[in-house]
């Protein structure tokens, strides 16, 4: 996201909690091309000062604790980051509406919880039960409340599983499988491999967020939530197979642990609303996205 905004010659202010030397942000030298503010979403005075001093016009709320396993082990810190962080930021935006003209909030397909009908549409209830899922349901509802009550110009994005360059969480299935395959090691599948998700290339997600932000002056768009998906759901074993082929290691077999808990078995999205209202569709898709992703990890891992 930051790289694309810089390429568009935007003036970008980044709130950075942790400096990671191998991060995509650092490797691209984006610290020198943006204004970096060190801090966290839990620090409300910092957020208000940041928005005020830099006269921020568009807010992309992407910060969160995003790891399901971490949320199960540490629900309090997850809710502090994801729930408190969201209402802190939206309150700061409310108090700076003189300059803040649009806010895009990243929710998740997990906000829906376990729904009886697939694919999920935007009018499905938000029923997250497990800690991470619940945090995203809250993020979603708080954002809608700030729009309905205070007319803070908010839109909400709900994506499936994002993948692409820059993800250094090796517990996620795509980066973990790529690293294992590059090392010629069996990839680890923590579930039984049958869990179904949709996978969205990060470049398609960035395009979706920016397209949404650009169209928020339309009354039929502002205040709305949008699903973004390539609408090609895959089981875990299917996505592992796709990754292994992309790395050119089709004969490697995954080590299936069957140890997943507090996870929904099948979860994927309809992007019909985004197609019809925004004219959005994925440019890269799974195959091209994986090819670009594998190339990035090969360079990273040597």
For the regions a language model picked out, list residue spans one by one.
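C-terminal substrate-binding subdomain of Rossmann-fold SDR/epimerase-dehydratase oxidoreductases
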Residues: 2-10, 14, 181-302
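N-terminal Rossmann-like NAD(P)+-binding domain of SDR-like oxidoreductases, especially those catalyzing
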Residues: 1-162
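The catalytic Tyr-centered alpha-helix of NAD(P)H-dependent dehydrogenases
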Residues: 78, 128-135, 170-174, 198-202
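Residues in well-ordered alpha-helical elements
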Residues: 45, 57, 69, 76, ...
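Residue-level signature of the cytosolic catalytic core of signaling kinases
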Residues: 30, 43, 166-170, 232, ...
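Generic structural signal for helix capping and beta-alpha/helix-loop junctions
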Residues: 22, 113, 164, 197, ...
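Proline-centered turn/helix-capping motifs that create local helix->coil transitions or kinks
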Residues: 98, 104, 114-116, 151, ...
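A glycine/serine/threonine-rich, flexible loop-to-helix segment
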Residues: 118, 169-176, 243
């Amino acid at each position: 996201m930051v790289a694309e905004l810089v390429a568009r010659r935007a003036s970008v202010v980044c709130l950075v909690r942790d400096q990671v030397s191998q991060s995509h942000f650092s490797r691209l030298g984006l610290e020198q091309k943006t204004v970096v503010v060190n801090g966290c979403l839990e620090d409300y005075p910092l957020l208000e000062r940041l928005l005020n001093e830099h006269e921020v016009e568009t807010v992309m709320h992407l910060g969160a604790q995003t790891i399901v396993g971490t949320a199960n082990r540490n629900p309090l810190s997850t809710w502090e980051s994801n729930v408190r962080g969201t209402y802190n930021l939206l309150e700061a935006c409310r108090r700076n509406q003189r300059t803040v003209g649009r806010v895009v909030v990243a929710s998740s397909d997990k906000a829906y919880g376990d729904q009886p009908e697939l694919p999920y549409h935007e009018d499905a209830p938000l029923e997250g039960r497990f800690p991470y899922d619940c945090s995203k349901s809250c993020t979603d509802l708080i954002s809608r409340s700030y729009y309905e009550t205070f007319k803070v110009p908010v839109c909400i994005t709900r994506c499936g599983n994002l993948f692409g360059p820059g993800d250094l969480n090796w517990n996620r299935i795509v980066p973990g499988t790529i690293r294992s395959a590059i090392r010629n090691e069996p990839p680890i599948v923590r579930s039984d491999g049958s869990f179904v998700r949709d996978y969205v290339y990060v470049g398609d997600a960035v395009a979706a967020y920016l397209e949404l932000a650009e169209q928020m002056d339309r009354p039929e768009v502002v205040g709305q939530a949008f699903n973004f998906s390539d609408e090609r759901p895959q089981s875990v074993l299917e996505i592992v197979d796709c990754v292994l082929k992309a790395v050119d290691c089709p004969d490697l077999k995954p080590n299936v642990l069957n140890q997943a808990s507090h996870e929904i078995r099948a979860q994927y999205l309809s992007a019909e609303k985004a197609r019809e209202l925004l004219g959005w569709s994925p440019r890269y898709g799974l195959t091209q996205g994986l090819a670009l992703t594998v190339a990035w990890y090969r360079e990273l891992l040597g």
